[in-house]
Structures are given as structure tokens and as C-alpha cells.
């Protein structure tokens, strides 16, 4: 649950009194005491490009006994701000909910708006949305693979994937001028079109990106000293995946045949 902000409905997951101030770093964290047991606190401000979060590890050597995650630093009261809309600012608020998923959030909002209005985006508009969604998905997954490599201290793949993620973001900028896809998806369709010359350039960049990504990622899986650090770490049972409603690679890794692109 969000530790540092009440929801706009005032139902506090931590059951704190309404008149109690909520301040970052004020609260009880789980602790493990013992000889050579140490605590590692990370965040909420990180050196990379990830959004803020506080992670507190209780460790013994390389064994992690307990991890507590405190989120909520990015909560800005947007749900409450959206009440009474839509208006001219609504789509811009939706696009800035999270930097990694501007296109996905904008598409979800537009699909809801179109369904309520009884209309649909044009076939070309839907195709351009689909391209932008796939580019956003690629950037996220490539970035995550690089981050995983960094987590096990395998810097070659971490560095390569960071650069390749930037190449994918630049492809999105080729479509609409924004590396995060802002301004592209709009109710009823899209805000930008793409001619044949631009699509040919996009295809050329995609081919180059695929080759680079395969080399960078296969390099990680061919390095036994890196692979061994992933073994038996973070495995999620299928039943838990169903209970949590996991989707995407996290769901498919547990054996669930889920793909929102196919299922919607």
C-alpha cells in the first residue's frame, strides 16, 4: 500500500487517524537483528531513470531475509484532479501519469472516451497507436533487461541496453516529435500522421535495433557468472500470478498464456 499519502477517498490503508500528518521516512519498518545482519536502504531518489521508491533490505551476506518497499512519492492527487472532466488538460494529465507508459495510458483513456461517445478511431489511427504502443513496450522491456543486468553487476549488457532503449525512444520521436509519445494519441485517432518515407526510416531503425538488442541480451545469458545470480530468485508461483492478476512477461514466465494485445 501507499505509505506516504492517503487516497482521495480518505480510506487510509495504514489506518492512520485523519488528523495525523503523513511525512516521508516517518513510520515503522520491519527489522531483523542478529550478528552480521545488516540493513541496506535504497532510494527514494535513484541515480538512474526509474521513478522514486524506497527499498529497505535486511541482509546476511548476499542472502536477503526481508525486503520492504515504500511507494507513493509520485502520487500527485491526479485521480481527484480528473473529477469533473474531461477538459483541455485531461489528456495531458493522463500522458504524464508515468513516463514509461505515456502512450499506454493515453490509449486506455481514449478508448474509454470513444466507447462512451459511441465512436472509434480510424483504422489508420489504430495502426499508428499500435506502432507507438509496441515501441513503448520495446523501450520498457529493453530497459528492464538492462536494469536486471545492472542488478547482478553485469555492466556490458546494462550499458548496451541503456543505449538501445534510447534508440527506441528516438523512433517514437520520429512519429510525433516526443520520445515519450506525448501528443500522438488523441480521442478519435492520433495527432500525427506518418508518410511512406518516415515509415521506411522507422523500419530501417527497427532492423538495426533488433540486431543490437539480440547481441546485448544473448551476451548476458551466455555469461554463467551472471546467470547464476538469477537462479531461484524472484520466482512467482502460477497460483500467485493468477491471484495478483499479473500480465505480460511476468505472467507468461509463470506459465499463464496472457497477452493483452491478443486478449483485448
Regions found by a protein language model. Name each.
Residues 1-264:
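Active-site bordering "gate/hinge" segments
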Amino acid at each position: 500500500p501507499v505509505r506516504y499519502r492517503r487516497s482521495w477517498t480518505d480510506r487510509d490503508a495504514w489506518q492512520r487517524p485523519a488528523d495525523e500528518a503523513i511525512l516521508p521516512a516517518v513510520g515503522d519498518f520491519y527489522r531483523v537483528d542478529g550478528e552480521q545482519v545488516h540493513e541496506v536502504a535504497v532510494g527514494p531518489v535513484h541515480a538512474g531513470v526509474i521513478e522514486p521508491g524506497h527499498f529497505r533490505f535486511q541482509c546476511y551476506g548476499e542472502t536477503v531475509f526481508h525486503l520492504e518497499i515504500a511507494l507513493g512519492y509520485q502520487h500527485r492527487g491526479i485521480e481527484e484532479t480528473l473529477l469533473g472532466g474531461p477538459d483541455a488538460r485531461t489528456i495531458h494529465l493522463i500522458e504524464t501519469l508515468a513516463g514509461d507508459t505515456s502512450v499506454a495510458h493515453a490509449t486506455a483513456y481514449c478508448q474509454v472516451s470513444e466507447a462512451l461517445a459511441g465512436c472509434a478511431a480510424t483504422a489508420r489511427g489504430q495502426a499508428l497507436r499500435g506502432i507507438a504502443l509496441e515501441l513503448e513496450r520495446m523501450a520498457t522491456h529493453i530497459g528492464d533487461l538492462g536494469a536486471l543486468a545492472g542488478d547482478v553487476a553485469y555492466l556490458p549488457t546494462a550499458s548496451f541496453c541503456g543505449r538501445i532503449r534510447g534508440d527506441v525512444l528516438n523512433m517514437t520521436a520520429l512519429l510525433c516529435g516526443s520520445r515519450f509519445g506525448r501528443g500522438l494519441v488523441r480521442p478519435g485517432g492520433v495527432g500525427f500522421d506518418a508518410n511512406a518515407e518516415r515509415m521506411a526510416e522507422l523500419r530501417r531503425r527497427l532492423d538495426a535495433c533488433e540486431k543490437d538488442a539480440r547481441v546485448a541480451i544473448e551476451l548476458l545469458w551466455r555469461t554463467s557468472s551472471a546467470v547464476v545470480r538469477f537462479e531461484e530468485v524472484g520466482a512467482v508461483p502460477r497460483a500467485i500470478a493468477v491471484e495478483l492478476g499479473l500480465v505480460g512477461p511476468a505472467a507468461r514466465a509463470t506459465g499463464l498464456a496472457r497477452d493483452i494485445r491478443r486478449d483485448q
